[in-house]
Amino acid sequence: MVHGNDVLHHNHFRKKWQFMVKTWFNQPARKERRRQARKAKAQRIAPRPASGPLRPIVNCPTFRYNMKVRSGRGFSLQEVRAAGLNPKFARTIGIAVDHRRRNVSVEGLQRNVARLKAYKAKLILFPLNPAKPQAMDAKADEVKKATQLRRPVLPITQRAKRLKAHKPTSSELRYSAFHAIRQQ
């Protein structure tokens, strides 16, 4: 206990603790700097999409998140070739390619091949030499109408099945999720 009329001490600080304090006074300026950098990059890479290259749809790992899908790093070589593209050429037309990625399911492969084909159908490819256009090059009037895409390229949506409300059956009332998971 305290003896006499002494102060109750609570301040157990280390020496020079003020130098170790982390402050966030630069947060609004950093936010503005990031915004300006995004804007500058969009102007620099125009007329390419501002959000960057097309990325694949991948399933999230682990038991907790495996019902969700998100964008991956890049398409596998198998997916790119199945869509009728050369991996080296695909990188030049705004498709991210990851040579390390492997396809573990046929459904995932088909989903990303369809994504690549949809991208290829919507793509406006500027000719390197307008006098000698290549096979995939766009026409002159399409090139004039082309604008930069500001939002994500082919945005990914969660596939959620909508169920209609119904009266629970006797088997549904007897069902226990805990016991079902424990038995697996």
Curated annotation (Swiss-Prot):
InterPro entries: Ribosomal_eL13 (IPR001380), Ribosomal_eL13_CS (IPR018256). It comes from the Eukaryota. GO terms for molecular function: RNA binding; structural constituent of ribosome. It holds the Pfam family Ribosomal_L13e. One of its GO terms (cellular component) is cytosolic large ribosomal subunit. Keywords: Ribonucleoprotein, Ribosomal protein. Residues 28-53 are annotated as: Disordered. The keyword Ribonucleoprotein applies. Residues 31-42 have a biased composition (Basic residues). PROSITE patterns: RIBOSOMAL_L13E. Belongs to the eukaryotic ribosomal protein eL13 family. This is Large ribosomal subunit protein eL13. It comes from Schistosoma mansoni.
